[in-house]
């Protein structure tokens, strides 16, 4: 694989995020730490332009509003027209009719480079579960076959996170086991990961490999952060520090990836 992290730091890809209030600051700081240049906006009046000029677009359904839903569709369609990869984080899909309708509209209208979600949300998209309760997955075991079903259904890469992370394009599948349970004890850790995928798909043409690289790098940063942190309060700044100090050599040294 290309030296993705070195290329991110060199190119400083512009990542347009339509995300939620809870995650916005944390995600922006994480993107800056890896070497990307983030924009965090959710007004429909800017969405088309940002979708055209970004190096990747991240659509996060966290604190959803009518305006945000409109902005996501505009940004996603503009990105598609300009060859810009789009990542979707369908938080709490199935939780409400409004949320599910917006997610369905995006899935029908926008060609996605990747879907990043927890195992419960992926199960909803696969039709295996009626609803997901949100960022905290109600499915503990991450089943590769469910992720593969969604990847094939939407012709995209699926990054399904859980105790073991699954990355698949429907044909190739990898199990990624880097990470730390402390990520479950801070808010917006999954949202940051979704944004984190953006720089990688902007510099790696094979989105499946980009997904593996992103989730593995993030997991390694979490592991190294917990060597210095004593709890969630000290973990957050330590995680940002370790993201900042990530290198391709460090990822190669610590990666735990098993391709099926």
Swiss-Prot record:
<feature type="binding site">
    <location>
        <position position="161"/>
    </location>
    <ligand>
        <name>ATP</name>
    </ligand>
</feature>
<feature type="binding site">
    <location>
        <position position="40"/>
    </location>
    <ligand>
        <name>substrate</name>
    </ligand>
</feature>
<comment type="similarity">
    <text>Belongs to the Thz kinase family.</text>
</comment>
<keyword id="KW-0418">Kinase</keyword>
<protein>
    <recommendedName>
        <fullName>Hydroxyethylthiazole kinase 2</fullName>
        <ecNumber>2.7.1.50</ecNumber>
    </recommendedName>
</protein>
<keyword id="KW-0479">Metal-binding</keyword>
<dbReference type="GO" id="GO:0005524">
    <property type="term" value="F:ATP binding"/>
</dbReference>
<dbReference type="InterPro" id="IPR000417">
    <property type="entry name" value="Hyethyz_kinase"/>
</dbReference>
<dbReference type="GO" id="GO:0009229">
    <property type="term" value="P:thiamine diphosphate biosynthetic process"/>
</dbReference>
<dbReference type="GO" id="GO:0009228">
    <property type="term" value="P:thiamine biosynthetic process"/>
</dbReference>
<comment type="function">
    <text>Catalyzes the phosphorylation of the hydroxyl group of 4-methyl-5-beta-hydroxyethylthiazole (THZ).</text>
</comment>
<keyword id="KW-0067">ATP-binding</keyword>
<comment type="pathway">
    <text>Cofactor biosynthesis; thiamine diphosphate biosynthesis; 4-methyl-5-(2-phosphoethyl)-thiazole from 5-(2-hydroxyethyl)-4-methylthiazole: step 1/1.</text>
</comment>
<keyword id="KW-0460">Magnesium</keyword>
<keyword id="KW-0547">Nucleotide-binding</keyword>
<dbReference type="GO" id="GO:0004417">
    <property type="term" value="F:hydroxyethylthiazole kinase activity"/>
</dbReference>
<dbReference type="GO" id="GO:0000287">
    <property type="term" value="F:magnesium ion binding"/>
</dbReference>
<keyword id="KW-0808">Transferase</keyword>
<feature type="binding site">
    <location>
        <position position="116"/>
    </location>
    <ligand>
        <name>ATP</name>
    </ligand>
</feature>
<keyword id="KW-0784">Thiamine biosynthesis</keyword>
<dbReference type="InterPro" id="IPR029056">
    <property type="entry name" value="Ribokinase-like"/>
</dbReference>
<feature type="binding site">
    <location>
        <position position="188"/>
    </location>
    <ligand>
        <name>substrate</name>
    </ligand>
</feature>
<dbReference type="Pfam" id="PF02110">
    <property type="entry name" value="HK"/>
</dbReference>
